[in-house]
């Protein structure tokens, strides 16, 4: 069954087990920072015919169908969407010919059903337990975790995008369920944790889960209220997630403690096995003691026999007996020492057993404490459940504020108690860990002491074995060598003569003196040593040359590769600074395969190039943001600078042409005005004066224009200087950065060279010391081999008998090795061998009697031979002395090796310290480079800002120059003062603009920092809001849509009302037109009256006043119009007609009224809320009416105080009556009713919102819950202040919650950092453990080699001792020929001793077999 992973890049074929990660050896390599080296594994389960995904506890985890998974195994189905890490490609699982397997989770209910009974929430919890999933070797699943696909039923229908869990939800699912009944909607809050549900909790109805809380929400709630409810629910989720994190931490601690308990139990089992071994050792020691007692008895009997025989023996026999007595006493002393050692070891064993019992008790106590801690954790889990139930009760009783507060206080107290308990528990856990560590260290110390004691016992046993073997071989060889001595002496002489001929040649070395054996041996040793040394030197030199040549070739190849790659990088950096090319070069350099001494330099160069590449990418991004394409950097820079200069020159040319055009326009205007004045004043006398005045003004204007041009040139020069200074500073800083980078690169290279030199020196010194040690060992081995060869040559003289004995000894050794395997078979074989040995002793006794007879006959002929034997004994003594010297040399060599190891360790420590120092320096250099890059980027940003400000200044100057030819005043009274004031005003304006620019630059710099901080806060708020929005249900979205529909309906109603208002305004305009027609009729009638009254000269002033009164009295009707243009016309008419007293004051008041009206209109336009539009319209109309009435009254009062008031009152009364009749009935009824309804709705909404906010946020002092409908102005101001105070309280509460969230996020970051440090420490610990294991293996091998060398030396000593004893036996035979019968009896006793010694030896051989 083939399976593929489908992605945007193609298809990837899955094997039975495919590894995924960043490591090169993984099957699917994903090069992204979110993925670990060994991220996950997809394995095929043949039992269930499905694929299983296993996450290796990665940092960012994996996502299966947008569900976060970490350290969990998940069964996959065709069509599952996988994503490794938080950001990366998505893969779809495609299986060819999938098996017809019915997935049980496909039968479950759909995840988003309609209205269901309350038991529907428990259905997912009753899902069957997950099937057994085979995990990868070395990876065990977490104990309290389940897979996403098994813990929750999968729907057959594809889920909508809104149901998927957001990325920021942190392993938790959060959902709202809204009942669709006629009751008010209930928001049910449900927390489920897909990664923590255990099978027990599923079977028992999830006792650890918190019951869902319900919040009753009215149907008329606004969207803001719902958002605030969602925020509060999210905060409660975060609060409960803290408890879940703490419980996780406790579970991890419990698992660690369980592992430690398991390790301790294993150690206890090992101690029990060691006890059994110690019991066996004690039994064997008892058997040895019994054998030693029997031997002592035999020795005493032998002493008594020897004392009886000593009377008739000669001096030679006395000497031999005394020597044997001394040997026996030494054996006794050794036996006593063995007994003492046995007693000491038994005491030590008993003390160790006591210590082990005490530690077992400590382990039991720790187990009890662990169980107690588990029970406490269970109690705390129950307490958490109780807390969850209390939270649900609190949510149900939101309306009852008093009970809610009391419960919250109780919860806070319990939380504090829980926190204190948790802290105490953590302290106790730390103490327990410390005690466990102490116990582990003590056990390790005890185990070491036991090992050392066992080694000492083994050495003692080996010594005793060797001595017993020596005794046996002495007895056997004494009987055999007596017979074959004659042949050996002849062969020795012949062999000696041949050796002399071979060494010295045919010529005699010393004609007068004979060649001694010592001279001959020295000559042979010299020749052999010279030959061996020559061969060894040749061999070592060949090896060294080969190794050095291979290493040099490898290093040269690696250095050449690195040089070529570095040359290409340097060429890329010199030719073009494109990030794409540099990235290619860095990738090529990274994929170079280099040996370890050059790899460190490669890493450092890669770090430097990556930093330069990141800086280059940031620069290119900035250039792209500015609109410059960074394809070819050199050309683009040139084009950019040329474009900037072209833009600057074009701006200059445009400014100059604008100025010339403005000057020409001014001249044209002046000419037109002059012509018009000349035409108007043809018949007047002041024509010449006006022309002179115009010429003066032209000259002044030209002077002002020239001065402005000069100032502009100065400003442009200053700008150019500033740009040059900035460019210079930027270039200097870039050069500094480059120099710093080069210096850092040189330093890094120097450091790498130093490291390489130190490594080479260390390696050479270590190799030299190893060679010296090997040469010393080999020379000593050669000496030993020479001695062995010499001895074998001497042994070959004693021909077939010695070979026969050796064969027998080998057979006996093989038999003893076989006896070690099975103790019972050995005992039987030893009995058979004892019987055989008794028979052999009889035969040997007969042979000895015959040999003694033969020796008596050949005593006289072999006197010379005895002298030769003595010389041989002397030589043997000398060889023994040489062996002792070799032993001392071996000890010295061992000491040297130990010292060398210590030196190597010290050098390694120094290397590590130097490495740490170099790494720290490199990190400091990297930080400095980052800081330089940041300063460069900030300076470039400042440059951009300065250029933008300069552009703004130029634009403002151009606008000011456009506005320079200001229109001249119409008044001809002060023509000379106006141009001076204008020029001074322009100068002041320029100065103010420059000051404003400087201040604006400072403010912009300060505001940019604030803007960056606000952007960060906005991004955080957006992320949180997106998380909360992602957790909304479909029903809440439906409610939001309904609210949107309501808002649209309200907007439509407002548009309808606006249309009605437009109709009303059209009606008002019609009425205004009618009023204008009436006014025109009145004016016509007034003109008629004037024509009639002109005839009467006496009544002119009265008629004038009447016309003024009528005009003034008609004006208020005109002022009640809505448009500002009509108002201005009425006031201008008044000003024209009332050109008498206080004309200027009236104009100023009109201007003030107009400015106030415009300001109010702007303020009303800024307010955009639809709820207050009607209110604004009404207030606007009221203000207009009041202002117009006040203005008209002031004009009437101030225009002419002498006018009669009766006429005003008579005309005003009918006008007011008309206005009230026309506007009161239509506007007041429609406008005031709408405004009142809108105000009531807004107050209701505000009161509901404030109540819900106060209840949700536990704000006690919400005192603004009072309607402002029937309150006076003072009371309204008080209520407004209270509401402002409530808003401040809400704002403070929200800021507190934000701060709490920030602190929690910081804690989480700290925890993540600690986890990463633990992972790194684990990796380093594993490395150190592997190194320690390697060192232990090396030490063990060296110890074995030393033991083999020691055994060879001991064999040589044993053989020499045997030859000494043979020579002594020969002497005894020569002296004691007369007393043969007594000697035969003595030999029989010796044979009996040998049989007893063999039996003891077999027992000693059986002891190590028990151990092994």
Curated annotation (Swiss-Prot):
Composition skew (Basic and acidic residues), residue ranges: 659-672, 955-973, 1086-1099, 1382-1396
Task: Cite the InterPro entries for this sequence.
Answer: CC-FHA_domain, FHA_dom, SMAD_FHA_dom_sf
Q: Does the keyword Coiled coil apply?
A: yes
Q: What PROSITE patterns does its record include?
A: FHA_DOMAIN
Residue ranges, compositional bias (Low complexity): 1397-1412
- Primary residence: other
Which cell locations does it reside in? Cell projection, Cilium, Flagellum
- Pfam families xrefs: FHA
Boundaries of every FHA domain copy: 18-69
Q: Which SUPFAM superfamilies match?
A: SMAD/FHA domain
Q: Name one GO cellular component term.
A: sperm flagellum
Does Coiled coil count among this protein's keywords?
yes
Please list the tissues where expression of this protein has been recorded: Testis (at protein level).
Matching entries from CDD domains are given as:
FHA_FHAD1
Region of interest: Disordered: 106-133, 652-688, 955-976, 1086-1110, 1372-1412
**Which residues does UniProt call coiled coil?**
250-466, 692-963, 999-1099, 1141-1169, 1292-1360
What domain of life does the UniProt record list for this protein's source? Answer: Eukaryota
Q: Tell me the keywords, alphabetical order.
A: Cell projection, Cilium, Coiled coil, Flagellum
Q: What does this protein do?
A: Regulator of sperm motility and spermatocyte meiosis.
What is the protein named? Forkhead-associated domain-containing protein 1
Organism of provenance = Homo sapiens (Human)
State which gene encodes it: FHAD1
């Amino acid at each position: 069954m083939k399976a593929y992973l489908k992605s945007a890049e193609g298809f990837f074929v899955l094997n039975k087990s495919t590894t995924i990660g960043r490591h090169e050896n993984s099957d699917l390599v994903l090069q992204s920072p979110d993925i670990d080296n060994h991220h996950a594994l997809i394995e095929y389960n043949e039992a269930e015919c499905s694929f299983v995904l296993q996450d290796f506890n990665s940092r960012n985890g994996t996502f299966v169908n947008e569900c976060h998974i970490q350290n969990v195994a998940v069964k996959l189905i065709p069509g599952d969407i996988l994503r490794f890490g938080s950001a990366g490609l998505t893969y779809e699982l495609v299986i060819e010919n999938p098996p017809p397997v019915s997935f049980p989770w496909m039968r479950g209910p759909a995840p988003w059903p309609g209205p269901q009974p309350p038991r529907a929430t428990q259905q997912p919890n009753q899902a069957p337990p997950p099937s057994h999933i085979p995990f990868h070797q070395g990876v065990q699943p977490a104990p309290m975790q389940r897979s996403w696909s098994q813990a929750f039923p999968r729907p057959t229908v594809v889920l909508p995008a809104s149901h998927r869990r957001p990325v920021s939800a942190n392993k938790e699912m959060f959902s709202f369920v809204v009942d669709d009944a006629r009751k008010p909607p209930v928001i049910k809050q449900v927390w489920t944790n897909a990664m923590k549900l255990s099978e027990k909790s599923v079977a028992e109805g999830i006792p650890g889960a918190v019951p869902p809380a319900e919040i009753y929400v009215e149907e008329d709630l606004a969207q803001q209220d719902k958002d605030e409810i969602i925020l509060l629910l999210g905060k409660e989720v975060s609060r409960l997630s803290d408890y879940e994190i703490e419980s996780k931490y406790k579970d991890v601690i419990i698992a660690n403690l369980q592992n430690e308990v398991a390790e301790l139990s294993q150690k206890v089992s090992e101690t029990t096995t060691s006890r059994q071994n110690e019991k066996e050792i004690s039994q064997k020691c008892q058997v040895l003691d019994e054998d030693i007692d029997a031997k002592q008895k035999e020795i005493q009997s032998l002493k008594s026999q020897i004392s009886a025989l000593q009377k008739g023996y000669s001096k030679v026999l006395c000497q031999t007996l005394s020597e044997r007595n001394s040997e026996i006493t030494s054996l006794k002393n050794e036996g006593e020492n063995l007994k003492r050692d046995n007693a000491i070891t038994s005491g030590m064993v008993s003390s160790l057993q006591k210590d082990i019992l005490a530690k077992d008790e400590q382990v039991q106590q720790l187990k009890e404490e662990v169980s107690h801690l588990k029970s406490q954790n269970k109690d705390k889990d129950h307490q958490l459940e109780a807390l969850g139930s209390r939270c649900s009760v609190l949510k149900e009783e939101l309306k009852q504020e008093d009970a809610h507060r009391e419960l919250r206080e109780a919860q806070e107290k319990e939380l504090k108690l829980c926190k204190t308990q948790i802290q105490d528990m953590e302290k106790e856990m730390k103490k327990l860990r410390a005690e466990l560590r102490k116990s582990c260290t003590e056990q390790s110390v005890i185990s070491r002491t036991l090992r050392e004691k066992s080694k000492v016992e083994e050495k003692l046993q080996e010594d005793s074995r060797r001595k017993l073997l020596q005794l046996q071989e002495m007895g056997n060889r004494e009987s055999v060598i007596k017979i074959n001595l004659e042949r050996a002496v002849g062969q020795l002489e012949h062999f000696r003569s041949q050796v002399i001929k071979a060494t010295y040649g045919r010529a005699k070395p010393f004609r007068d003196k004979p060649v001694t054996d010592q001279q001959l041996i020295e000559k042979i040793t010299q020749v052999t040593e010279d030959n061996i040394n020559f061969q060894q030197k040749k061999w070592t030199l060949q090896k060294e040359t080969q190794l050095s040549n291979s290493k040099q070739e490898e290093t040269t190849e690696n250095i050449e590769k690195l040089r070529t790659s570095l040359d290409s990088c340097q060429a890329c950096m010199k030719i073009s600074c494109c990030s794409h090319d540099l990235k290619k070069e860095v990738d090529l350099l990274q994929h170079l395969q280099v040996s370890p001494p050059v790899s460190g330099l490669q890493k450092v160069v890669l770090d430097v190039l990556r930093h330069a590449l990141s800086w280059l990418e940031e620069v290119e991004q900035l250039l792209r943001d500015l609109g410059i394409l960074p394809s070819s950097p050199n050309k683009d820079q040139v084009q950019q600078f040329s474009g900037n200069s072209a833009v600057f020159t074009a701006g200059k040319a445009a400014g100059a042409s604008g100025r010339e055009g403005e000057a020409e326009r001014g001249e044209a205007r002046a000419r037109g005005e002059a012509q018009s004045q000349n035409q108007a004043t043809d018949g007047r006398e002041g024509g010449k004066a006006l022309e002179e005045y115009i010429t003066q003004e032209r000259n002044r204007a030209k002077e002002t224009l020239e001065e402005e041009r000069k100032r502009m040139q100065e400003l442009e020069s200053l700008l150019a200087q500033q740009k040059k200074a900035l460019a210079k500073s930027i270039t200097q800083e870039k050069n500094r950065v480059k120099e710093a980078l080069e210096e850092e690169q040189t330093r890094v290279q120097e450091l790498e060279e130093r490291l390489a030199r130190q490594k080479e020196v260390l390696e050479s010194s270590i190799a030299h010391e190893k060679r010296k040690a090997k040469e010393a060992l080999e020379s000593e081995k050669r000496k030993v081999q020479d001695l062995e060869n010499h001895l074998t040559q001497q042994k070959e003289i004693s021909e077939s008998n010695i070979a026969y004995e050796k064969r027998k000894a080998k057979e006996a050794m093989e038999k003893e090795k076989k006896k070690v395997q099975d103790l019972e078979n050995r005992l039987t074989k030893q009995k058979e061998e004892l019987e055989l040995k008794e028979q052999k002793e009889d035969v040997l006794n007969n042979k000895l009697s015959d040999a003694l007879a033969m020796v008596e006959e050949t005593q006289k002929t072999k006197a010379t031979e005895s002298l030769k034997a003595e010389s041989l004994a002397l030589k043997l003594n000398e060889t023994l002395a040489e062996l002792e010297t070799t032993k001392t040399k071996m000890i010295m060599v061992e000491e040297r090796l130990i010292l060398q190891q210590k030196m190597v360790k010290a050098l390694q420590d120094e290397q590590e310290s130097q490495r740490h120092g170099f790494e720290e320096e490199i990190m400091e250099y990297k930080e400095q480079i980052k800081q330089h890059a940041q300063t460069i980027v900030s300076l470039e940003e400042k440059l951009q800002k300065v250029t933008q400000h300069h552009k703004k200044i130029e634009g403002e100057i151009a606008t000011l120059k456009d506005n320079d030819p200001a229109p001249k005043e119409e008044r001809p009274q002060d023509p000379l003062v106006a141009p001076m004031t204008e020029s001074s005003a322009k100068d002041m304006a320029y100065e103010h603009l420059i000051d404003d620019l400087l201040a604006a630059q400072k403010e912009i710099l300060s505001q940019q920092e604030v803007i960056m901080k606000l952007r960060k806060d906005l991004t955080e708020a957006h992320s949180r809001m997106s998380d909360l929005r992602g957790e909304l249900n479909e029903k809440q979205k439906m409610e939001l849509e309904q609210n949107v529909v309501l808002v649209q309906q309200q907007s439509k109603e407002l548009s309808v009302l606006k249309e009605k208002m437009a109709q009303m305004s059209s009606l008002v305009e019609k009425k205004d037109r009618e009023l204008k027609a009436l006014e025109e009729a009145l004016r016509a009638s007034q003109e008629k009256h004037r024509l009639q009254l002109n005839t009467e000269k006496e009544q002119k002033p009265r008629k004038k006043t009447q016309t003024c009164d009528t005009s003034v009295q008609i004006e208020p009707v005109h002022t009640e119009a809505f448009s500002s243009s009509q108002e201005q016309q009425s006031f201008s008419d008044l000003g024209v007609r009332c050109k008498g007293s206080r004309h200027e004051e009236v104009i100023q008041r009109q201007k003030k009224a107009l400015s106030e009206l415009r300001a109010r209109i702007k303020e009303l336009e800024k307010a955009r809320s639809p709820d207050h539009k009607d209110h604004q319209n009404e207030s606007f109309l009221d203000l207009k009416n009041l202002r117009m009435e006040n203005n008209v009254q002031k004009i009437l009062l101030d225009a002419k105080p002498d006018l009669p008031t009766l006429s005003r009152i008579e005309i005003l009364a009918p006008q007011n009556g008309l206005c009230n009749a026309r506007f009161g009935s239509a506007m007041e009824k429609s406008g005031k009713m709408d405004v009142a309804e809108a105000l009531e709705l807004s107050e209701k909404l505000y009161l509901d919102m404030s109540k819900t906010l106060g209840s949700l946020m536990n704000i006690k002092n919400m005192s603004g819950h009072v309607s402002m409908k029937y309150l006076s102005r003072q009371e309204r101001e008080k209520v407004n202040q209270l509401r402002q105070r409530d808003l401040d309280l809400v704002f403070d509460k929200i800021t507190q919650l934000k701060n709490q969230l920030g602190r929690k996020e910081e804690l989480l970051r700290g925890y993540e950092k600690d986890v990463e440090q633990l992972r790194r420490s684990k990796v380093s610990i594993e490395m150190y453990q592997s190194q320690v294991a390697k060192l232990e293996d090396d030490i063990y091998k060296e110890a074995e080699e030393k033991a083999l060398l020691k055994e060879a030396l001991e064999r040589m000593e044993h053989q020499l001792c045997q030859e000494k004893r043979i020579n002594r036996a020969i002497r005894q035979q020569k002296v004691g020929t007369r007393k043969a019968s007594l000697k035969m009896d003595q030999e029989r006793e010796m044979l009996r001793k040998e049989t007893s010694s063999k039996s003891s030896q077999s027992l000693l051989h059986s002891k190590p077999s028990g151990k092994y």
